Amino acid sequence: MASHQQRTEIRDGMRIDWDVPVTMDDGLVLRADVFRPVKDGKFPVILSYGPYAKSLAFQDGYPSAWQRMVEKHPDVTAGSSNLYQSWEVVDPEKWVPHDYVCVRVDSRGAGCSPGFIDHFSPRETKDFYDCIEWAGVQPWSNGKVGLNGISYYGINQWHVASLQPPHLAAMCVWEGAADWYRDMTHHGGMLSTFWENWYDMQVKTVQYGAGERGKRSRVHAELVCGPETLSDPELARNRADFGTEIASHPMDDDYHKARSAKWDKIVTPLFSAANWGGQGLHPRGNFEGFVRAASKQKWLEAHGIEHWTHFYTD
């Protein structure tokens, strides 16, 4: 089997297409994993697009978080082999049996997708748009694409919904900040160092080109960061200097506005799920989104406990 080429297998009650190529409007090819019912048909799609390496198991990427969650909430693991659990996105084993297709796309420059990493940028948002429209016209799709995910996978839903993709039918923003300046980089006008630390720990470790220095999938044993192994200077040239960029924009300027929600443009039916904790990041975005989005159909829920626990429980 050629490494990191599209391939299909049937296992655990699903038809799985690994590393499906998805071509962007500038010609760059991203890679997606598609989990779908074994039977033929056209089904609604749940899509996520983000930087955490689609093939990296939750248990391998975030072992302490996984262990705490399953010890305190053992129902998380019920009804699933948990082989396909991945950080902050849906478990396909719990959705595919209900006739959904689950699509996970590695964002530009991350996981198995090459390119330049520039988080929450207009380029990334356009990629997300292209992925939604791609999913909406596939032979296994009924043309209705929903978005669902936590944190990063929620934040970028606000952004892409502002572009109004024709095939976007609904969105579930689970703990997703919205105002790049106020929620994320400058709390009360004061610089937050969270993003620089996050970049080092959660993005650089799964950047495309980490290759043999990265992890392998516990499902298919392929490298989760693509077939190439790039040098440190090559990797650095393929990503924005995120912490420096944020620090160089101390005011709420065009840099921040380009990475923030445009509420009057968001008309998609939405479910906004906030956490009473995590005050330094997400809750404001969820409440603001519910109040200010132009969507006619919108719902708000607020929960406690950890960042992700309720998302994975029934």
Predicted feature locations:
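Short glycine-enriched nucleophile-adjacent loop
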Residues: Y153-P165, M171, G289
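Alpha/beta-hydrolase fold nucleophile elbow
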Residues: P139-Y152
